[in-house]
Amino acid sequence: MLTDMEISRQANVRPIGWIADDFGLGKHLWREAGHAMAKISLEAARAPLRGKLVIVTAVTPTPHGEGKTVTTIGLTQGLHLLGHKACACIRQPSLGPVFGVKGGAAGGGYAQVVPMEVMNLHMTGDIHAVTSAHNLAAAAIDARLFHETRLGCESFSAKTGLPALNIDPERILWRRVVDHNDRSLRQIELGLGDNNGPVHGGGFDITAASELMAILALCENIADMRARIGRVILAMSRDGKPISADDLGVAGAMTAIMRDAIEPTLMQTLSGAPCLVHAGPFANIAHGNSSIIADRVALAHHDYVVTEGGFGSDMGFEKFCNIKSRASGIAPSAAVLVVTLRALKANSGVEGDDRARLEAGFANLHWHMQNVMGYGLPLVVAINRFPDDAMAELDWLKERCLEEGAFGCEISDAFSHGAEGARALATAVARACDAPVNFEYLYDDEMDFGARLMTLAERYGAAGVSLSEDARRDLAMITELGMDKLPLCMAKTPLSISHDPSLKGAPSGFELPVVGLRLSAGAGFITVLTGKVMTMPGLGLLPGYLNIDINDKGEIIGLG
């Protein structure tokens, strides 16, 4: 079989204007961003919603993923093949995983967004806009600290006419960001050298973990984005008051940098189905879903909209339900859970023959099935087939899924056969979308912080929760600010349902260690840091960039 790059290169990429016409967008609602991309006006999101939203999730993945994006794109192509008007909504890839271990995020095989190298490398620069806006705030808070320290607060106010913020250098909360995996930047010292400001600690996160990325994904329009950015808390004053981006006077400039990034980007799949690519928060350290705006645009113009939540259902799907859907008010009509035989065996935690490993690993799939169905959604299990999968094992898995209450279960060959390989899956999903839905959140808005945290922990299988001293201090600050009722965004390993990647299957009886809390007042949630999770990834022993180069024709090679 050809590589993803070779398949993408051989694709008949249609002019993006044709895709926009099929989408149903008048010329005033989009503008070209090159031959293969278009930016969509926010006006396109104002039409009444007509479509049904399908959320794609997965079992606990192996490090290379189980084909969730392949399934999302393949399912969209399959629905398109059946004559339905269908659109995919996915996140913009971060350069971190592209050059790290996982590779690109455009799908794969014959279920791709094309051109894949355009999607995986920069696209329309939205992530860079988020990076620039975020780091402008970081520069502004340090500059204000420098000048107030140099002049003294009274003299600063007299010279500038601005109120002194009296920033506490030990309580600057706003870390810098960059769109790469770089562990050396996790903890740094700022202000070193003569006349560079008071020395204080800091660090970098990956841009996908930026609160601005979450705001981009959760806002409804430009005014909402501006208001949310203004509420972002950058630091605390020496007398314990929060200092927001509006207080610093930088929120307007930050929004200006992100003005064009708020518009979703229209691309196409190999079969010519439309795909909206917008925002890129990670699911393990952020809320892990594409934008509300993209969903609204797609739902206003299509019968079916297929989106995905990052990693397993304990990660992106949970946040889709409790953060994104809560913010948008849009409930999904059905869910698709992607599983592979490889993932079941990897999640078994045992050695032995394949059947024994499958039996043990099924506990993980069973947990994810119960988790998804617990939100009141019809569930279709998609078995993503690999070339060496044994048919007897696939049949066994399909039968078990149906026995455990799945609305449907189909083998997907989208990777190898594109739309035709997802025909059966698309048929099952269309049927599921007509089934009764009783969608509900996992916790109520009025539950206190401890009750909401324990509800999530118990869903993971934990017997209890422990808060470190840092986490308790963070909670005291958040409570004092009156923001302890915000939804929770769990930051943890994606390689286990628990906080510990070594706990396979469906662990239970463990204690969930909370090591810190981060308030995202603009995005509207509290990030709960657990275990040894890092908000800045690192490159591995054999990173993906080793495979990437450019040939004499100027073509990128080795990507994917």
Swiss-Prot record:
Main EC class the enzyme belongs to: ligase
Catalytic activity: (6S)-5,6,7,8-tetrahydrofolate + formate + ATP = (6R)-10-formyltetrahydrofolate + ADP + phosphate
UniProt cross-references to SUPFAM superfamilies, sorted A to Z: P-loop containing nucleoside triphosphate hydrolases
EC numbers on record: 6.3.4.3
A single GO molecular function term of this UniProt record: ATP binding
Pfam families, A to Z: FTHFS (PF01268)
Keywords: ATP-binding, Ligase, Nucleotide-binding, One-carbon metabolism
GO biological process terms, semicolon-separated: tetrahydrofolate interconversion
InterPro entries noted in UniProt: Formate_THF_ligase, Formate_THF_ligase_CS, P-loop_NTPase
Pathway connected to this protein: One-carbon metabolism; tetrahydrofolate interconversion
UniProt-annotated binding residues for ATP: 62-69
Family annotation (HAMAP family): FTHFS (MF_01543)
Entry's family note: Belongs to the formate--tetrahydrofolate ligase family.
The protein's name: Formate--tetrahydrofolate ligase
Species of the source: Shewanella amazonensis (strain ATCC BAA-1098 / SB2B)
Lineage: Bacteria, Pseudomonadati, Pseudomonadota, Gammaproteobacteria, Alteromonadales
Gene for this chain: fhs
